[in-house]
Amino acid sequence: MIADPHCHTLASDGMVTPAELVSAAVTARVNLIAVTDHDTMASVREAQQLGEAAGLTVVAGQEITTGWPAQTHVVGWFLDRPVRSGMSVEDTVAAIRDQGGLAIIPHPFIPVYFGSIQPAMLRRLLDVTTVDGIETMFTAPLGSWRRRQLDDFYVAHEERLGARIGGSDCHFGARDLGCVVTRYEGDFRGAVTRRTTVPLKTRERRVPAGVALRQQWRSLVDLPVRRLRGEL
């Protein structure tokens, strides 16, 4: 079975509707996706309804922005309701688990100031709690040195980091959905809990420069403005 458990729609900074996302997943022949928009679950219900009709499992999720100054991201899966943004990383993990969800660290160690947890912060988090999984394979550029650093970090902290996860961080529908996936056997949640998941890269992401620039505007300008307005 194949999952792409990190996908976005127009509800946050993705470039596709829920219908387009589901269609892309069916075309890519994945068995499961998770809708993980930034700080909102507005597209989840529609995607789940469309997925059910298409024979696709859609997990209710969210990519939550933690508080300043870190503003890193934590993904929650199997959520019943949105998780409030702006909390500490450890409180965000706790809020996900309080409603029975799984807490996942997305795209770690990318050398940017926000959005990607850094080694020292992740080490501090693991001093006080565990997580259910961490993306060890993703589409964002990491570089060979940081890739080795991530691999070594996972080996050293596997018991507290949970399952190895692969996800495309899909923002462009058919252009990137399924580029990086998670292979699993049986029930997805059970496979994550048992740590039997296997991250895989299936192809390169191919997104025209103009489309990528429009998405970056949505991410870096439109999304923060919506947060300031209280829309997220």
Residue ranges and their predicted role:
Residues 86-91:
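Ordered, amphipathic secondary-structure segments that act as subunit-interaction surfaces
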Residues 99-104, 108-109, 161-163:
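Short beta-strand/loop segments at the ligand-binding rim of alpha/beta enzyme cores
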Residues 38, 63, 108:
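Short, ordered loop/turn segments at secondary-structure junctions
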Residues 3-5, 9, 15-23, 42-48, ...:
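Charged catalytic cores and adjacent phosphate/nucleic-acid-binding surfaces used
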Residues 10, 22-42, 59, 101-104:
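Divalent metal-dependent hydrolysis catalytic cores, especially in the metallo-beta-lactamase
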